[in-house]
Amino acid sequence: MSQATFEIKNGPSFSGYSFGADKSISGEAVFTTSLVGYPESMTDPSYRGQILVFTQPLIGNYGVPSMEARDEYNLLKHFESSHIQVAGIVVADYAAQYSHWTAVESLGDWCKREGVAAITGVDTREIVQYLREQGSSQSRILVEGSDTPKFYDSMATHLVAEVSTKETLYVPAKNPVANIAVIDCGVKVNIIRSLVARGANVTIFPHNARIQDVAGQFDGVFLSNGPGNPETCHETIENLKELLANEDLQQLPIFGICLGHQLLALASGGKTHKLQYGNRAHNIPAMDLTTGQCHITSQNHGYAVDPQTLPQEEWKPYFINLNDQSNEGMIHTTRPIFSTQFHPEAKGGPLDTMPLFDKFFNNIECYKTHLSQSSYRMVSQIPAIDKKEIMA
């Protein structure tokens, strides 16, 4: 292993050893307290441009499964996207020897193959304590013998444009009951799986697609998760504003998760703010304000919606974080639209809130019933969609 250093801008440095790619990188340092699921976390597009610090001390002990494995819908079985999305990882104790029946390579070999920096042998407890007190910080992993990059503010970059699909994709259901449009801001594979498994033919659009022009072809619209500052997604926000203002689609069901929740809030006139160190874990309690029930949720976000800035006659808070009291969801007062900051489809993580997908499909069923009782589909002219089947 080469000598390596984890360096925080205007903060401490930590000496260790590289077990990933022989290159230095920079990015925003964030941490996750999740105990398992490092393959899913590292391939989650929401982590794009970030250096992920694991609080779990032993990482890599069950290796990395095959990227070739597919499920019954031909979606990736073990990962949230087809490549590692994090800029680098920081672990206390890397397990070079791994053991799991699905594993085909070590975490270190995977990082080397994907060109991702990785450092071990550092005190992650001290790093996380610093990040909790000072907030998520610009940082670098410096590997001996490689060029030194400048500190990079990934949050000032339009990261969604990097991870969103460049063409319209299509994932068919075996027994379809609905057609759903997904705005891909960095959508996780398990979100697509959660929709298709419930009978949705899913059409995945680029983040800047004019969804307002084709929404009339669909029974519902889903706004996906994704990386970075939501305010950089100007095109998506403007498109959503037009969609929400369309008088012919006032009853179209819409569901947003994570960044999709934030973009829906911005399109509705609300504001977002950056959290000091974000919420990234599999065990965060959130209360459903409509029932008073508490659910354990999986989260990965550095920004939050300010519910006080939403139009109060149209929106009300849906969920609240019981740790820091931040907003975790909102629901429209008269239309079938709702969103959550957390991930109901958690992989890994708890499945307490998976029924929110069922709520979305119930809204779709009501919408389809409403349309069947009308004499026409309430959009005058809809352009054709050129789409490619399969999601890599």
UniProtKB/Swiss-Prot annotation:
Q: Which residues form the active site?
A: C258 (nucleophile), H343, E345
Molecular function as annotated in GO:
ATP binding; carbamoyl-phosphate synthase (glutamine-hydrolyzing) activity; glutaminase activity
Stretches that traverse the bilayer = none
What EC number(s) has UniProt assigned to this enzyme?
6.3.5.5
Which Gene Ontology BP annotations are present? 'de novo' pyrimidine nucleobase biosynthetic process; glutamine metabolic process; L-arginine biosynthetic process; pyrimidine nucleotide biosynthetic process
Q: Give the source's domain of life in one word.
A: Eukaryota
Keyword annotations for this protein, in alphabetical order, are: Amino-acid biosynthesis, Arginine biosynthesis, ATP-binding, Cytoplasm, Glutamine amidotransferase, Ligase, Nucleotide-binding
The Glutamine amidotransferase type-1 domain, residue ranges: 179-370
- Spell out the GO cellular component terms annotated for this protein, sorted alphabetically and separated by semicolons: carbamoyl-phosphate synthase complex
Primary location class: cytoplasm
Subcellular localization(s) per the UniProt record: Cytoplasm
Q: Which biological pathway?
A: Amino-acid biosynthesis; L-arginine biosynthesis; carbamoyl phosphate from bicarbonate: step 1/1
| Alphabetized NCBIfam families for the sequence | CPSaseIIsmall, PRK12838.1
| Function according to Swiss-Prot or TrEMBL | Small subunit of the arginine-specific carbamoyl phosphate synthase (CPSase). CPSase catalyzes the formation of carbamoyl phosphate from the ammonia moiety of glutamine, carbonate, and phosphate donated by ATP, constituting the first step of 2 biosynthetic pathways, one leading to arginine and/or urea and the other to pyrimidine nucleotides. The small subunit (glutamine amidotransferase) binds and cleaves glutamine to supply the large subunit with the substrate ammonia.
Would you identify the family this protein belongs to, as annotated? Answer: Belongs to the CarA family.
Q: How does it assemble?
A: Heterodimer composed of 2 chains; the small (or glutamine) chain promotes the hydrolysis of glutamine to ammonia, which is used by the large (or ammonia) chain to synthesize carbamoyl phosphate.
Instruction: State what protein this is by name.
Output: Carbamoyl phosphate synthase arginine-specific small chain
Q: Which organism is it from?
A: Candida glabrata (strain ATCC 2001 / BCRC 20586 / JCM 3761 / NBRC 0622 / NRRL Y-65 / CBS 138) (Yeast)
